[in-house]
Every structure is written in C-alpha cells, then in structure tokens.
Amino acid sequence: MLLLWFGFFSFIFGVVIYRLYFHPLSKFPGPKLAALTSLYEFYYNVVLGGRYLWEIERMHEKYGPIVRITPHELHVADPNFYTEIYAGPTRRRDKDPRLVRLAGQPTSMFATVDHGLHSSRRAILNSYFSKKSIAGLEDMIQGKVQKLVKRLSMACDQGTVVKLDAASSALTADIISEYAHGFFPFLLDLSKFIPDKVLEKLWFHAANILRLQKLVRAQADVALQNGGKVDGQATMFGALCDPSLPVQERTLDRLQDEGFSLIGGGTETTTGTLKIVMFHLLNEKALLLKLREELEQYPSSTWADLEKLPYMRGTINEGLRLSGVITRLPRRAPDEALVYKQWTIPPNSLMSTSSHFVHTNSDLFPNPLAFDPERWIRAEAAGQRLEHMIVTFSKGSRQCMGNHLALAELYLVISTLVRRFDMDLYGVTADNIVTHREYGFGVPKERGEGLRVSITRVRDP
C-alpha cells in the first residue's frame, strides 16, 4: 500500500515538474496554477459559472498579450494575430479532439479534427452557401418573414406579449431546414411563441432536441434511398450522398450529424444577433428612429439594397460585434512554428483567440461595450476597414459557411421589424441581454424569459 502511495505522489510530482519546467509551453507567461492543472479553468467555468473568459482577460492585463491559460493551451489577445491562428486553406489547422466531442455530432464538419478531411467535407457544401446561392433564396426567406409579420400582427391585435428571440429561432430554423433538408419543423406556422411558453418547450427542451434529431435522421434515410431527394425535392443530402464520395462519407450517421449541425449553426448566431440589435434599438428609441428614417428614404427591401444603407449596415455590424460564439476555438498548427513578437509557438501547440477580445478591443472599438452603429460610418469616412475585424463567423478555412445566409436573414428580418412595428420592451433589462457568462455563446447575468416585447402598432408597409 505504501508503495502505491509513493508511486502516486511520484507521478504527481513528475507531472508538476514537467508542466512547470519542461513542457513546450513552460516558458510562456501566465499563472502557475493554470499551467499545472485544468482545474483552474474548471473552477471559473463550472463553480463560478462561465466566467473563465474574464479571468483570461485579467491574465492578459497582468501578463501581456500572450498567456498560457491551461497546461496545454496559449491564448493571444491581439486582433492582428487572429488570422495566424485561424489561417486560410493553404496552412494546416487542426482542431482539438477533446473539445469537438462536446459538439455531439462526431462526423459533422464542425467536429472534424483533421484539416484535410474538413476541407473535403466543406467542399461538398460550399456552393450551397455562396452569396449567389443565398441571394437565390431571397424569395423563400421573404415568404417566411411575411408569415412572421402576420403572427406579430395577430399578437398586436390580441395584446399578447411576444418572445422575439423565440420567434427568430422559429424563423431561422424553418429557413435552414427547408433549404438543407426539404422540410421545416413547422415552428413558425404553429406560432407557439405566442402567447405561452410552448415554443420554448418545443424547441429548447432536451426531449424535443432528440425529436428533431430523429426527424433529421428520417429525412436523411429517405435521401439515401432516393438519390438525395426528399419528397421528390433536391436537397443538400443529395450532395452528401453523391456516389462519387467514399462509402464512409455516405453513411446515415454522417448525414444525420451534418444535417443536425446545419440546423444548430443556422439558428443560434442569427437569433443571438437579432436579440442584441432589437434590444438596443428598443432600449434607446433614438437609434430605432434613425434607422427607420433611413429605411423610409430607401423603400427597397432587397438584401442587396439594404446592405448599401450605411446606418443599416452599422446596426447589423454592431449586433454581430456584440453577439455570437465567444468561446475559445483552439487550433493546432502541426506543420509550422508560429512567431508572435519575441515568442515562438512550437508546432502542434493548442492556441486560441476568443472573438470577445477582438470585438471589445478599445483601440479598434472605442467605448467597446456601447451599441453605436455610427462608429462604422465614422470608420468608413476615415478610410478604416473596420468590417475586417468582425470575426463573429471566425476566419480562415473553418470560417462558418453559413455567414451569407445569416446576414441575409438579419438584414431582411430587422429591416421588416423596424419598418412594420412599433413595440416596447416588456420587463427586459440589460441584465437579461448583455453577456456576463460564456457557455459557447454569451449568456446574460439573468436569463429571464427572453426578449419579450409588446407590439403597440402595426405600421403600413
């Protein structure tokens, strides 16, 4: 027994000495406890509840722009180094296999560790998400938006409080499901976001997530048996089960994982951004009135025309800047040592930069926590290409391929809401909206019941 204890403590002592003095990252600055054990991160993220990102922020204030934040990971808080970590397709970047398991869809593109395999999987679907392809969906998106207008108009007539973020989730889930899989889960048609909490139970309850997974699996099975078609309609499943692909890439599990991943990725970013934008517009009505004035001067409602409106574009950019995935997305560069200032990062080291540190950088964005659409107009007038610093969709070879779809939805939905409805916040404060914790996406200090609004008037089109 004594020998067992001696062996155990000898092992622990060896790990401590190795991590502090001989590990490839041992020369990098940071707290010794973070270098020794991942329990340091565990304490902030689990015990304190999603607060490690702000502890990393404190580390950078103390130790500088590059910090060892776990025994095996570096974090760099320099926006100019972002595209080195999240590099383009000619430079290999692998994911951390320990982290992608959390995604829950192990054969999806999002959970693919290897750079080469990810590139080949992405190539299958790239054309579906090009800006040209998404522009071709505009009539379908507009049709869904008009259904939303009808539901919100009914809520106005009935004096019903609406959960605007739940409505957005329903809308975006319908759009990506119909486009990708040839079906939609009827969330918008059921209008369960009005007047009770049924939609929340339907969409976010674990049992119903499983139900949706089964539905996606059933559609994938139909597609596999019918040359990629569902009910005679061509879908993305057709590309995923193309006979030219390797057999292992055409399994039912693979189609289900990719299909469900598309729904999740096609819903959360858009909804989170819309929630941030609409909260700030309704919380500071001068912003809303300025946007409405610009929209009334240019009555066209096409995505292409809306993108040209300076204040509209600034509003969307501010929403993107203050929302989205803020968790670290670690990468490895297995084939090269990266150099940051006087530091050489050894090949295959885990490294990351949270979008939070780019989007709240006060040199790029003075008064970074303020929602200020005009900062983008000022930057453009000064010749600054500030939009290149929006990393909500990440950058490089693993950038979110659904960015054009998300942007189209945001421009079309937000412009319609501002044009067609007068509404007020209903029992919602900044503590229910502004990011205070990190659980992948930013989470507010107080969860509340979502972005609840009362609609006071339906305006003429």
Curated annotation (Swiss-Prot):
Keyword Nucleotidyltransferase: no
InterPro entries per UniProt: Cyt_P450, Cyt_P450_CS, Cyt_P450_E_grp-I, Cyt_P450_sf, Cytochrome_P450_monoxygenase
E.C. numbers: 1.-.-.-
Gene Ontology BP, a term: conidiogenone biosynthetic process
Locations listed in the record: Membrane
Residues annotated as transmembrane: 2-22
One protein family per Pfam: p450
Pathway, per record: Secondary metabolite biosynthesis; terpenoid biosynthesis
Residues annotated as binding heme: C400
Entry GO MF terms: heme binding; iron ion binding; monooxygenase activity; oxidoreductase activity, acting on paired donors, with incorporation or reduction of molecular oxygen
Keyword Transmembrane helix belongs to the record: yes
A cellular component term, taken from the record's GO annotations: membrane
Class of enzymatic activity (EC top level): oxidoreductase
Membrane topology reported for the UniProt record: Single-pass membrane protein
Predominant localisation class: membrane
Cofactor(s), names only, from the UniProt record: heme
Coiled coil: none
Family that this chain belongs to: Belongs to the cytochrome P450 family.
Protein name stated in the entry: Conidiogenone synthase PrP450
